[in-house]
Amino acid sequence: HAFLDGRDTPPASAKGFVETLENKMAEIGVGKVASLSGRYYAMDRDNNWDRVEKAYDSLVTGDGIKAESATQALQESYDNGKTDEFVEPTVICKDGQPLSLVKANDSVIFFNFRPDRAREMTRAFCDDKFTGFERKTGFIPLTFVCFKDYDESIPNKKVAFKKEIIKNTFGEFLANHGKKQLRLAETEKYAHVTFFFNGGVEDPNVDEFRLLVNSPK
């Protein structure tokens, strides 16, 4: 089940990626692309649950646009002016039936490290008390594995790579040697030179000064 980017990648690059993937799967004899969905639907982060519901239903109930192949579906979407980010949830079928749907007791691996756009779909699958939309099949028991812990409040999930405590970051090293440091960035990259650069720690080091310059709007 492929979630397409098109914002942090060229807007119509998914077709090439999907073709490469399908060729490799055909070579090794394992796997098929069973559905497509643009990130606008599958990886929303602003509680637009109506979008997430469309992507979820394509995975679970087979509702959505139908296509005979992923590459055909992408080309038709491009022809209709909808590039990767906005590809409507599409179910790949054979003889009129979905190739594969997510069902009870399946194992699912969510191949995404960044949590902000993975939380909503993960919650829709894992939260037995989910209220974002009505799940037509109810709560489905799964072995659902996230690449990292997208949100500690989401139950019934497993985490492949637990958060590591990073010791003696470069900022700590400078502070421990009595050096001053300035972290300077515009709004969009401020977190990168502070929180992320400090190994996921929000508080500044001793003599670490921060200056935020508003990004142009």
Describe the predicted segments one by one.
Residues 1-217:
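Feature captures the catalytic ectodomains and active-site-proximal regions of enzymes
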